[in-house]
Amino acid sequence: MAYGLLLLRAFTGAAFAGHGTQKLFGWFGGHGPQGTGGFFSSLGYHPGVRMAVIAGLGEAVGGTLLAFGFLTPAAGTLVAIVMLNAIAAATLKKQFLLGSELELLYLVIGISLVATGPGRFSVDRALGWDDNITGLWWAVGALVVAAMVSAVTLTTFRSKPAPQAATQP
């Protein structure tokens, strides 16, 4: 099980951090803060560039922490916050699970690793923290915090869509 958790955690964390560096620096074919900010603005997030930087930091920091198994509850919570916002943005455009599968997968993996712990090959284990900061209640807490932060983000930094003009039959 230790090797499976290491593989899952390291790959997921690295991939998630890679998405963050796309937003922050334009690495790996990303568009950087300006390009990603325009995309965020098109989803109704304002200011778009600031939200792109915040999402990029959440992904880069959360992914790096997850990859190393360091502060795993914080890492899983960061992953969940960013992914809940991404899923909500897609859902508000009436596209739930039409392109949101990756976001849902990251969310489930992040919260699952909070529940199981990072495994034997992790910084948390090396520091003797893994048994104290994992489990069901840590996962529930991480999900609740993520939902609350996401709700605040969606209600504070996302504008409501403009009313659609009525069409004649």
Residues covered by each model-derived region:
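Alpha-helix boundary/capping detector
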Residues: 33, 46, 65-67, 110-111
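Membrane-interface interhelical connector segments
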Residues: 26-54
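Hydrophobic, membrane-inserted alpha-helices
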Residues: 57-66, 82-86
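Extended, low-polarity transmembrane helix blocks
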Residues: 1-28, 49, 71-169
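Physicochemical signature of membrane-embedded alpha-helices that form the seven-helix bundle of GPCRs
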Residues: 51-54, 58, 78
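Generic signal for short, ordered secondary-structure residues
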Residues: 18-19, 40, 63
